[in-house]
Amino acid sequence: MAPNARDERIDTNDPQRHLVYAAEDSVLDDIGRRLRRWTDVEAFVEAILADPAYLDLFPDAPLDVVLDRRSRSARASVALPDRATILIRDGSWNALTVLHELSHLVSPDREPHGVDFVATELALVRRFCGFDAFATLASTFVAHGVAAASVPLASARGAD
């Protein structure tokens, strides 16, 4: 199995995992930008955490997030919600991977790629990659059979 290959087995605690991964893999180059240097990854995460809309959309989201690198030989990037930590695999420095892992911190759930996670990821993509990227990912999720809760857009606080 290639180091970045996604495991396709169905996990009964996370039945959408393989669908989410397949959908994301099919549009990876179309969602957000490629982050060329590690400092670009750090700056992207800092910009998200500093954006007032982040807390407006997700009032309980962590603001103090630990970001670290994983070696290229690691199988995948990973989020550790109980530690507010994101580990990004070398070679996976792109906006969608960062937003995917951040979504795990924002929406920790018994079902890691469940409907709330998908809605969170879509909201982050819309805010930080733009509407076209959001529409692309949303339609790709639908085409792959991925279910999502309602996507939060912003609270009334942000409307002033």
Over which residues does each language-model region extend?
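Metalloprotease/metallohydrolase-associated module, dominated by Zn2+-dependent proteases
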Residues: 1-89, 93, 109-160
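Active-site recognition of the HExxH zinc-binding catalytic motif
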Residues: 96-108
